[in-house]
Amino acid sequence: MNIVILAAGMGKRMYSDLPKVLHPVAGRPMLAHVLDTARALSPSRLVVVVGHGAARVREAVAADDVAFAEQPQQLGTGHAVMQALPLLDDSQPTLVLYGDVPLTSAATLQALVAEAGTQRLGVLTVEMPDPTGYGRIVRDAAGSIVRIVEQKDASEAEKAIREINTGIIVCPTGHLRKWLSTLRNDNAQGEYYLTDTVERAVADGVETVSAQPAAIWETLGVNSKLQLAEVERIHQGNQARRLLEAGVTLLDPARIDVRGELSCGRDVTIDVGCVFEGRVHLEDGVRIGAHCVIRNSTVGAGAQVHPFCHIDEARVGPAGRIGPYARLRPGTELGEDVHIGNFVEVKNAQVAAHSKANHLAYVGDATVGSRVNIGAGTITCNYDGVNKHRTVIEDDVFIGSDTQLVAPVTVRRGATLGAGTTLTKEAPADKLTLSRAKQLTIDAWQRPVKQPKK
């Protein structure tokens, strides 16, 4: 099967320099969602018709399985499909989709393709409570589709029809090529309508059939930021429903954003306002507090992520305790029962089991052993202004508060660093190391007195 995706429109009502089909739904361009659905149908040829912002669209979705056709002037849907004809295989039917209709399911399209077979024209239609603005499906007394009339060209009787054309069609490619060559633009819009192929099919004795989606929202197009927001909420509602049906506890299903793939084990609980980006896996018994952002990460079984944490390309081990207000940056790997507390940042560091950094610390480019206590205000000074260097902290180390470890440096097993230490060379095992200015008390000192203003 050939699949053609129309993605040439300007999107004037978006009031944006970004091509319409690149506006995101769930963090990804609308067109990317349509391409994913198209690929689920295993097409032999996949063609995207570009126009407005063509270079940006090509760059955004370029792939080995995608060919591009260009529509320099946007002269209607029929004209757009004409541009793809040289890239199509006439021995296969062609399915036409739209880059600004991101929620259509593969199951709905498969049903349409099955209904049409290889010899019939198939149209995806839907009954709308208010069909204003949409092309109407006109049927004869026997219920057969005879034509599609656009809103601006419809009579009053035709405007009363509630069954509308979604624009998605499938038909034999040879017939499509013939019918497109006969299209005229003598209509209110002055455009070449793809929908006019229905009348050509009827005239040629080609049966026209229809299929309907499981839900109206599958066919919603986006022409404004308001419609984009509506589609986003529908999509997020669908994601929330999927999670709930899989046994995840969402404290408010209306306040979660999944911008990628979120998979969960058993007895997972997610509080309000959380955002999941990329591929995220939450293992059994995980609890995510309110307003966390988690991207391309795994959270181990029984771990708790307290509110307002940011976790990016990191792995939290089983029974971990993160936050509140903690940040785990790329390359962070935490072992079992590791505690990363409030206002602690960890970057490109491996922290072994049962270690803790509970307050106000930066652990970057470091290897931390087991049962290590990192005191409040501890900083791994990993950057010399040009290069990054690593800090190694072995098992059972105790680091006092307000300590700086100037990398590259190693703290040996069982060592203790006194509060306020600036460590510039290796701290030996099982010993106390500290560097601290001598404390002085100046008996004759007096606090300055504020001078009156003149």
Swiss-Prot record:
Which catalytic residues are annotated?
A: H359
Report the subcellular localization: Cytoplasm
Pathway involvement of the protein, from the record: Nucleotide-sugar biosynthesis; UDP-N-acetyl-alpha-D-glucosamine biosynthesis; N-acetyl-alpha-D-glucosamine 1-phosphate from alpha-D-glucosamine 6-phosphate (route II): step 2/2; Nucleotide-sugar biosynthesis; UDP-N-acetyl-alpha-D-glucosamine biosynthesis; UDP-N-acetyl-alpha-D-glucosamine from N-acetyl-alpha-D-glucosamine 1-phosphate: step 1/1; Bacterial outer membrane biogenesis; LPS lipid A biosynthesis
Query: Which residues hold Mg(2+)?
Result: D100, N223
Kindly state what the record says about how the cofactor is bound. Answer: Binds 1 Mg(2+) ion per subunit.
Q: Name one GO molecular function term.
A: magnesium ion binding
User: Which residues bind acetyl-CoA per the record?
Assistant: A376, N382, Y383, S401, A419, R436
Q: Which GO terms describe its biological process?
A: cell morphogenesis; cell wall organization; lipid A biosynthetic process; peptidoglycan biosynthetic process; regulation of cell shape; UDP-N-acetylglucosamine biosynthetic process
**What cofactor does this one take?**
Mg(2+)
Q: Which Enzyme Commission number(s) are listed? A: 2.7.7.23, 2.3.1.157
Family annotation (InterPro entries): Bifunctional_GlmU, GlmU-like, GlmU_C_LbH, Hexapep, MobA-like_NTP_Trfase, Nucleotide-diphossugar_trans, Trimer_LpxA-like_sf
Q: Where are the transmembrane segments?
A: none
Q: Name one Pfam family in it.
A: NTP_transf_3
Q: Which GO terms describe its cellular component?
A: cytoplasm; membrane
Give start-end ranges for the coiled-coil region(s).
none
Query: Where in this protein does the record put region N-acetyltransferase?
Result: 247-454
Reaction equation(s) it catalyzes? alpha-D-glucosamine 1-phosphate + acetyl-CoA = N-acetyl-alpha-D-glucosamine 1-phosphate + CoA + H(+); N-acetyl-alpha-D-glucosamine 1-phosphate + UTP + H(+) = UDP-N-acetyl-alpha-D-glucosamine + diphosphate
Q: What does this protein do?
A: Catalyzes the last two sequential reactions in the de novo biosynthetic pathway for UDP-N-acetylglucosamine (UDP-GlcNAc). The C-terminal domain catalyzes the transfer of acetyl group from acetyl coenzyme A to glucosamine-1-phosphate (GlcN-1-P) to produce N-acetylglucosamine-1-phosphate (GlcNAc-1-P), which is converted into UDP-GlcNAc by the transfer of uridine 5-monophosphate (from uridine 5-triphosphate), a reaction catalyzed by the N-terminal domain.
Q: Which family does it belong to?
A: In the N-terminal section; belongs to the N-acetylglucosamine-1-phosphate uridyltransferase family.
> What is the protein name given in its UniProt record?
Bifunctional protein GlmU
Q: Which organism is it from?
A: Cupriavidus necator (strain ATCC 17699 / DSM 428 / KCTC 22496 / NCIMB 10442 / H16 / Stanier 337)
